[in-house]
């Protein structure tokens, strides 16, 4: 059951949550007023000044982070996926993040969309911001990791968080200029225990693309096919755009992807328009390179800079055609780029790396 906002932009706490807060700090009830039998409203005016629980509890949590008492802290990862659909990339992303946080010593729970507001004791919320907004509880440390759909997040929403991580250096720099809350760049990453090199001859394809259409004929596939290249495609919705003999399947399980990535000669990658415009590099780039895969991607700056030029990008259909032909005929060049890219990812872009970055950033936060 989700919290709501009323007309005066006050935060609504449902009765069970209110009772929990009241028990922890009886003084808080003076800041609450009844609206009906099911809801209590806490005034949003000078939020941190009025919420006595937040005033004292957040510094205690921060002190434990600074002193590395991670085993005394519980982290809730708010995953955007619904319980009924665990094929979303967010679901696997959440579990990889959980594993790395637990290695660090934290107690970690994953809350899928329907369980975001369950009555559980939490110290730190890490919200993987995708399609839906999360209405935060101010007595906990709240972290947003904006990994997709940046066009759907307002400045007002960002400002409610103690720290905001953005999976794009370009967008993070834009937000730093106009937000008061702390903003840091935190790119996506990979789990090398899930994505690693493992070639299988029966999965060897010249050119592979994995992804759904969302009712859009994705440009990199369109450009490749119109130039006469044979692309093996896995994903939902392609019947509308291409011959069925090119469609190899609708879905590859996440724990099988590494075999397909490792075995193909060229993996094609692209970005949705909002991600490309704001330079959010796809998680597929990290996963594929961890498998030692050669990748050609649409042209975004971070695809080149993050991986030291070991991702090949293209400008238009003619450029793509030339690069596909060249690299199919030069396996040594493919392997050289893939090997260097893998080394960069394993050294710099794993979930363990990102958890270290998150913890160091949390140590520096201040409560406004």
Where are these regions (language model features)?
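Structural alpha-helical scaffold elements that stabilize or flank donor/cofactor-binding regions
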Residues: 118, 156-157, 259-260
